[in-house]
Curated annotation (Swiss-Prot):
HAMAP family: ATP_synth_beta_bact
The protein's name in its UniProt record: ATP synthase subunit beta
Cellular localization per UniProt: Cell inner membrane
Membrane topology: Peripheral membrane protein
Cellular component terms (Gene Ontology): plasma membrane; proton-transporting ATP synthase complex
Gene3D superfamilies: 2.40.10.170, Bovine Mitochondrial F1-atpase, Atp Synthase Beta Chain, Chain D, domain 3, P-loop containing nucleotide triphosphate hydrolases
InterPro entries cross-referenced by the UniProt entry: AAA+_ATPase, ATP-synt_VA_C, ATP_synth_F1_bsu, ATPase_a/bsu_AS, ATPase_alpha/beta_chains, ATPase_F1/V1/A1_a/bsu_N, ATPase_F1/V1/A1_a/bsu_N_sf, ATPase_F1/V1/A1_a/bsu_nucl-bd
GO MF assignments: ATP binding; ATP hydrolysis activity; proton-transporting ATP synthase activity, rotational mechanism
First-listed, main subcellular location of the protein, grouped into a coarse class: membrane
Amino-acid positions noted as binding ATP in the UniProt annotation, renumbered to this chain: 148-155
First-level EC class: translocase
Reaction catalysis annotation: ATP + H2O + 4 H(+)(in) = ADP + phosphate + 5 H(+)(out)
Length: 464
């Protein structure tokens, strides 16, 4: 093992000098002697000097301290022993439940599966959330992004998806908390514990109070654990189907931005790192399904200032199979989940995948909502009375559709007092089919607000 010494410290970026013939490789992990601090080599500057990022606080470090190279990348524990545990970016337990009892470790930097190994699936994953199942259905082994600005419900939507999918799904889940609130990580842990699925979930946290090195690598740590479960074959030669939840992928980009300038790179558009697309690609290309097993990933993506054209969310869009866009306008009108039915898309919304009936109903719903959007300007200027009868009908139906897209969530029960509802896809299709056909034109629109299936609407209307 070669050893060197610290010659410069600027925030999270540390320069270390080694003997010229024993310079560590890029991505090798270095250990600062006498501390818990791990460094990761990012650049070789020449003359035996390497530039590194600290995985943890640099408090108390000083020039001249000795550093030992491990001659290997950062590796983390993998396997069944990680289930039910909370770990940090280096795979160290932070739940005070003793060490992670496994000998198996894998490096966090790995190659993405080759093109020949990948396998696509068209099996649908029912979420029980009407607007998602109807307009932007998820595929098993697909990648989903939840896009939204601050406070429109990304985390609540993700928690509900975890509640509906992870609890019903017999496989394993990995949750990577990247630069998010510690409170949310804590809530998630207790949510899993209370519903008795903690022994099927591995949790990796690098929250927003952590240094940028942790936030930059914690997504890779979670992904490495998920890849192990996917690739570990059972006696039939099959891997597992794994769910990977990442909250929030934007903070991964942000951590890269924080260290990029310190590493001496010129910033690109809006101050992001010039390697933004590559860093995102390296992470996203590994989140994929192979012939042995699948990784279905659901990622929350923060949208700065509600601007979807910002380079960070725009780069993420390219990698996803389904995009669920949360809208501030819909949230402000009191409709939750605040999912925009016209902006959200999915590759699975294809008659060959979801079937002709589902496809036609979804498109008809979008047509009605689009027509209503166009009529809004006329209504604002001239009022409803000036519309043709047929347009009035479109408006009434569109308002009912909008309200019918709202739904009480299980994870929000403690706040709203309303029991959560899970609506099967068949029920969702039946409800919207009837709505479009005019079967429920006589029911007042408030009966459609915050209910489950269409039968509840009818029952609610009778009480009004």
């Amino acid at each position: 093992m070669s050893s060197g010494r610290i010659i410069q410290i600027i925030g999270a970026v540390i320069d270390v000098e080694f003997e010229r013939n024993s310079v560590p490789k890029i991505y090798d992990a270095l250990q600062v002697d006498g501390t818990e601090t791990t460094l990761e080599v990012q650049q070789q500057l020449g003359d035996g000097v390497v530039r590194t990022i600290a995985m943890g606080s640099t408090e108390g470090l000083k020039r001249g301290l000795n550093v030992t190279s491990t001659n290997a990348p950062i590796s983390v524990p993998v396997g069944p022993a990680t289930l039910g545990r909370i770990m940090d970016v280096l795979g160290r337990p932070i739940d005070e439940a003793g060490p992670v009892a496994t000998e198996e470790r894998l490096p966090i930097h790995r190659q993405a599966p080759s093109y020949a190994e990948q396998a696509a699936s068209t099996d649908l994953l029912e979420t029980g959330i009407k607007v998602i199942d109807l307009l932007c259905p998820f595929a098993k082994g697909g990648k989903v992004g939840l896009f939204g600005g601050a406070g429109v419900g990304k985390t609540v939507n993700m928690m509900e998806l975890i509640n509906n999918i992870a609890k019903a799904h017999s496989g394993l889940s990995v949750f990577a908390g990247v630069g998010e609130r510690t409170r949310e990580g804590n809530d998630f842990y207790h949510e899993m514990k209370d519903s008795n699925v903690l022994d099927k979930v591995a949790m990796v946290y690098g929250q927003m109070n952590e240094p940028p090195g942790n936030r930059l690598r914690v997504a890779l740590t979670g992904l490495t654990m998920a890849e192990y479960f996917r690739d570990q074959k059972d006696e039939n030669g099959k891997g597992r189907d794994v769910l990977l939840f990442v909250d929030n992928i934007y903070r991964y980009t942000l951590a890269g931005t924080e260290v990029s300038a310190l590493l001496g790179r010129m910033p690109s558009a809006v101050g992001y790192q010039p390697t933004l697309a590559e860093e995102m690609g390296v992470l996203q290309e590994r989140i994929t399904s192979t012939k042995s097993g699948s990784i279905t990933s659901i990622q929350a993506v923060y949208v700065p200032a509600d601007d979807l054209t910002d380079p960070s969310p725009a780069t993420t869009f390219a990698h996803l199979d389904a995009t669920v866009v949360l809208s501030r306008d819909i949230a402000s009108s009191g409709i939750y989940p605040a999912i925009d039915p016209l902006d959200s898309t999915s590759r699975q919304l294809d008659p060959l995948v979801v079937g002709q009936e589902h496809y036609e109903i979804a498109r008809s719903v979008q047509n009605v909502l689009q027509r209503y959007k166009e009529l809004k300007d006329i209504i604002a200027i001239l009022g409803m009375d000036e519309l043709a009868e047929e347009d009035k009908l479109v408006v009434y139906r569109a308002r009912k559709i909008q309200r019918f897209f709202s739904q009480p969530f299980h994870v929000a029960e403690v706040f709203t007092g309303a029991p959560g509802k899970l609506v099967p896809l068949k029920e969702t299709i039946r409800g919207f089919k009837g709505l479009l056909a005019g079967e429920y034109d006589h029911i007042p629109e408030q009966a459609f607000y915050m209910v489950g299936g269409i039968d509840e609407v009818i029952a609610k209307a009778e009480k009004l």
